[in-house]
Amino acid sequence: MKKTTEIRNIFLNFFYEKKHKIMDSSTLIPDNDKTLLFTNSGMNQFKDIFLGFKKPKYIRVATAQRCIRVGGKHNDLNMIGKTNRHHTFFEMLGNFSFGSYFKSDTIQFAWELLTSKKWFDLSKEKLIVTIYYKDIESYNLWVEKTNINPKNIIFIKDKNNILYNSDNFWTMGDTGPCGPCSEIFYFFGKSINYKNIKIYDEEYIEIWNLVFMQFNLHLNGKLSRLPITSIDTGMGLERISCVLQKVNSNYSIDLFKKLIYEISKIIEIKNIKNYSLRIIADHIRSAIFLIYDGVIPSKEGRGYVLRRIIRRAIFHGNYILNKSCFFYKLVSPAINIMSYIDSKIIKKKKEIENIIKEEEKIFFFSIKKGMIFLNKNLKKIKNNILKGEIAFKLHDTFGFPIDLTNDICIKNKINVDEKGFFHAMNEQKNKSYKNSCFNKFNLKLLNNYCTKFCGYSYLKCESQILNIYNLKEEIKEIKENQEGIIILDKTPFYGESGGQVGDSGEIKSKDGVFSVIDTKKLGNYFYHYGKVIQGILKINNKITAYVNKIKRNKISLNHSSTHLLHYAINCLLDKNIIQKGSLICEKYLSFDFSYGKKINIEKINEIENIINEKIRDNVIIHSNNMDLKNALKIGAKALFKNKYKDLVRVLNIGDFSIELCGGTHANRTGDIGCFVITNFSKISSDTYRIKAITGETAIAFIQKKFNDINTISSLIKSNSNEIVNKIEKITENLKILEKKNKNLKNKIIKNYIKLIFNKIKKINNFEIIMDYFNEEIDKIILREILNKVKTNLKNGIVILASIKKDNLYIVTGVTNNLVNIITAKEIISYFKEIKSIKGGGNSYFAEAVGVVNLIDLKSMFKKIFMILSKNLK
């Protein structure tokens, strides 16, 4: 019996002999495709080559690619353990050609590897091949180039009569490279029932998919030929091992048998066929390689998928098999078994073990509480459906992923209201939008002390760590790559409030560095959210806090500018206008206000001018603390009347602006430098929003606009003072020319149509029009002529061509009542058989291009007419 590792080597050695470059597997995190959570097939690392964005280093390649199929389009998580075939982690063996060889060689390579005694030596009678029903070329090659029994070839049609929606037509997405494929199945039974072959029954297993990438799929659903054809094949290692080792389940191959045996020893269970053991065995493989490739358990993205996998396995060990912390103990034996995939993983064994151990500890305490809550609610269930909000509380409070809740409920013959679950999740997301990075932490509001804020005067200070939080609880220390929240006894970091975003920067101790991503003030404390980028930080550590100076300065300039904007609006529009909302960050400021009248661009320019005048005045910006009553007496604007304490901070800009404000500001208006309004819009019936930029950002914006004007002036050969007039004239002339062009085009079409009906040839009752232009005609015009001629035919075929300097463009159309006899696509295929041209289409319309001289075109027309004469008898 061949071992799985031997089978893997045989595959790679076979293609090495066929002049393929054996390349390493890419990581499970795609670096060239943001649309993918994980690498889920062998072709992912070559996607840019298939799309034509990148030239291949090698034109023949073979790989053993590690893959994950959880989340997104390919999600096998809920199938694990229930079927003999599915895995979240597997290896995909594949051979690839980038313009080197195509269908013929691919089919011959596959047949040789599978059936030759030198290689896999599988019985030819046991192999079934499925092909796309329109891919006659592949069928002929299978029959001619191999000794397969034609009975063992099955045509697969489109699903729901949707063109190219077939298991045997592979697409990369809604558009892009695509093509038919040949899928190879192995039959486990004794004899094939040729009258009723059911390839999706358990007796059959798909072992290899050969994808022939020869087309480009367009948004309109049409296909065009790719300039270079490619090959992408995929063979699941676990599946081919299942066949070659003559076992009915992937979980019975040597690798899984060893792994399941090791797991059964660790968790002390004798029944190695237990359903939960399959899940645990599969999930430990995924968890190990995800962590090896840089994923850490978390509450979102790839980290959350890893968390789901780990927690599902823990649950099956803890709840089903009654074992406490065990999952991390599987890391060592699993790596020993799987190190053939990448030997470097051995050095990461301890690190992977620790990460899983930490996650297991966190979840272990939640399982018991979660199960008490779930069991309590299961007793109250009506109609055998668990409410979505209950499933969401299990997810949100106890860390139960939805698939885990599903597993438990299925065991109790209960369905989960998944629609209600996702509704509850979306509701919470909407509520917590503003505080998204903090709401994932289970924070206590502490009232026995308060963080002292020194950020008005200092951007650096010495302090001490009071508390540290991870996702669920207060912890004593936080390590490298862990995210969390740190609370200090004193901070220079401004906490988000009054529309101003929180500060970022660094917190440094002698043993570690914590990167502060955001800061928020909750209760009496400032919460610093971020991630440890070096070392470790502990409670009571003495630290130095550093605010990001550049970011803070930009925010301060924008905040002072918001006050100037408020002043200018009051001066120009209405003195009673009050700010309705604002956002002040380092990139820009936005200011919302209510006003019942229309505001034109001239008013916006005036507002901008008032602000820049005050900036040039370079007046002092200063603040002082006073009691609320006195502040209101001296005319300070209070935007949030019910939210102020008795002692308030009053901000003065010169003698013209006075507001209650807790934000950070410039020292003088001149520090702002420049103020530019970039956007002005109405966000509701009576509310306007102004967006603006300041300082260096504003200067860069003005410079770009100036450069754009110069470029346009140069292109239209005008000086900048006359640019608008010149563009208006160009636009007017363009409209006139477009009208003339349209009239001329219509005349050409009209005149030609009159002449062309004299050229009708008849075959029985069918009307045939074949004509060409000995000049280059615009493709759109030629298509229009074809459509108009076709509408005037009752029962006919139209073939039109334009040719100039041997460049041929040909279109063909067939009336609706003829497509059952002959299609436009078939007619183009006849042209392609006569001469090497490229094209395609559908039943009613098809087109092609190529290099053909006039003599050859006339000859082609004669031959096509003869073919049509035979077909239309």
Swiss-Prot record:
One GO-annotated biological process of the protein: negative regulation of DNA-templated transcription
Leading EC class: ligase
Cofactor note (record): Binds 1 zinc ion per subunit.
GO terms assigned for molecular function: alanine-tRNA ligase activity; aminoacyl-tRNA deacylase activity; ATP binding; tRNA binding; zinc ion binding
Catalytic reactions of this protein: tRNA(Ala) + L-alanine + ATP = L-alanyl-tRNA(Ala) + AMP + diphosphate
Protein known as: Alanine--tRNA ligase
Quaternary assembly: Homotetramer.
Gene that produces this protein: alaS
Family annotation (InterPro entries): aa-tRNA-synth_II/BPL/LPL, Ala-tRNA-lgiase_IIc, Ala-tRNA-ligase_IIc_anticod-bd, Ala-tRNA-synth_IIc_core, Ala-tRNA-synth_IIc_N, Ala-tRNA_ligase, Ala_tRNA_ligase_euk/bac, Thr/Ala-tRNA-synth_IIc_edit
